[in-house]
């Protein structure tokens, strides 16, 4: 902000505290920082939007507001007085770039509740999810997808997330910023979910997703599984998946008008996809490899510390 720039120019704030940092905040006190701003000042500053948000919510937490005040009815702690220590408080930069949750297996509990209270998985409900994530210093969300279509059911779901600083992705079997329900509801238009026999329509479905998310901060899930979160088939050739990813990245590049590597992507090695990877399936260097458990909490694979460095990094689902 212009205010922070004035403080930096006046030497009231050290430039290297926030410069070139990711999602970092500082909370500090200043005395007579600028002309016209006399007395003691409490300053919350961030290296970027989320850094600033985390700083505000960290102060809220230390005052006595739990991140779960809304979702779990945690009482707000009463304080007779609030004191601020001199010096600089910070959590530093996050060690993990993308930190978030997947709203999965949401029916009947959450689905029934949000339908009764908000009319569905819409922005009236998601605003509370976004706030919770930010208060927990998270930044990433895979939205509910059993019967919901995050992008289509409420056109405000995605823009609100982007405005608040939440990065949206789609689940392991929903590639190219599309929800499975979007395909299921228009199956007569798009045809069978089979890339070998219906490439043109599926590519169109993919392209529409990237066009819709263009300009927003999202992580694009790539590759493909079978229809409705099922395996593609026992005889699936890894070369088919590699070709699908090649075509998807071409679409990403065409729509965004920049190299595909400039758009964050992940490939989820869920279930049988890990077996393809073990057989030598090639993953582009810039794509995040999302390792997964076996649905029972048993981690199937960890990054090999002796393997060649993978620039795209790794995640755990």
Tell where the protein language model's regions lie, with residue ranges:
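Short, glycine-/Ser/Thr-/acidic-enriched flexible segments
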Residues: 1, 49-50, 106-108, 147, ...
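Contiguous, structured surface segment used for ligand recognition
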Residues: 1-93
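Aromatic-lined substrate-binding rim segments of carbohydrate-active enzymes
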Residues: 147-176
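The substrate-binding groove and active-site-proximal loops of carbohydrate-active enzymes
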Residues: 43-46, 104-123, 138-148, 183-202, ...
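Gly/Pro-rich turn-and-neighbor structural signature
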Residues: 75-83, 152-155, 160-163, 190-313
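Hydrophobic faces of well-ordered beta-strands that scaffold small-molecule active sites
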Residues: 99-103, 134, 140-143, 168-171, ...
């Amino acid at each position: 902000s212009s205010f922070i720039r004035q403080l930096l120019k006046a030497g009231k704030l050290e430039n290297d505290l926030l410069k070139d940092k990711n999602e970092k905040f500082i909370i500090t006190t200043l005395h007579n920082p600028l002309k016209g701003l006399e007395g003691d000042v409490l300053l919350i500053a961030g290296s970027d939007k989320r850094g600033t948000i985390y700083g505000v919510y960290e102060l809220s937490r230390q005052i006595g507001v739990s991140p779960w005040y809304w979702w779990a009815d945690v009482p707000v702690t009463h304080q007779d007085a609030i004191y601020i220590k001199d010096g600089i408080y910070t959590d530093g930069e996050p060690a993990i770039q993308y930190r978030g949750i997947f709203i999965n297996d949401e029916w009947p509990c959450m689905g029934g509740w949000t339908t009764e209270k908000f009319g569905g998985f819409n922005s009236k409900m998601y605003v509370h999810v976004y706030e919770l994530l930010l208060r927990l210093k998270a930044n990433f969300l895979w939205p509910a997808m059993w019967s919901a279509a995050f992008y289509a059911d409420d056109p405000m779901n995605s823009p609100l997330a982007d405005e608040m600083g939440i990065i949206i992705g789609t689940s392991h079997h929903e590639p190219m910023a599309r929800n499975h329900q979007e395909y299921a509801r228009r199956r007569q238009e798009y045809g069978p979910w089979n890339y070998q026999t219906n490439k043109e329509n599926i590519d169109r479905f993919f392209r529409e997703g990237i066009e819709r998310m263009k300009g927003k901060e999202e992580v694009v899930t790539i590759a493909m599984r079978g229809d409705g979160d099922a395996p593609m088939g026992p005889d699936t050739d890894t070369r088919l998946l590699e070709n699908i990813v090649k075509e998807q990245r071409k679409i990403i590049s065409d729509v965004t008008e920049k190299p595909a590597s400039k758009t964050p992507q992940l490939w989820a090695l869920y279930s049988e996809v890990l077996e393809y990877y073990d057989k030598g399936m090639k993953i582009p260097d810039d794509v995040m490899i999302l390792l997964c458990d076996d649905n029972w909490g048993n981690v199937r694979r960890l990054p090999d510390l002796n393997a060649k460095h993978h620039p795209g990094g790794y995640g755990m689902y």
